[in-house]
Amino acid sequence: QTHQSHAAVNYYSKNQCTWWAFKRRAQVGKPVSNRWGNAKNWYYNARKSKYATGRTPRKFAVMQSTAGYYGHVAVVEQVYKNGSIKVSEYNFYRPLKYNTRVLSKKAARNFNYIY
């Protein structure tokens, strides 16, 4: 199933985590809605929009957390054989900046995923 509605224009604030996740998913042909709001709401809104979701990381899935005031999203770039994952994201280590990081298999279990 493809999800094309509301996916043409990136209305998220530039260089925020949601802006990057929207942009990256469009780049890899897996668009998400531009109307899901703050990162903390993405998992709920994805489910409401009939996206497949779960607790297991997959390549190009959105990794989502409700921690903090706004929550956080990142994009899974790689799932390694040992279960660790590499994610790309904005606004995590430094305000409005891009970074990648590797999370252990144990750490990766603490997040929701939008496929």
Where are each of the predicted segments found?
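Secreted/periplasmic proteins that engage bacterial cell-wall peptidoglycan
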Residues: 3-80, 84-90
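Aromatic- and glycine-rich peptidoglycan recognition patches
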Residues: 80-115
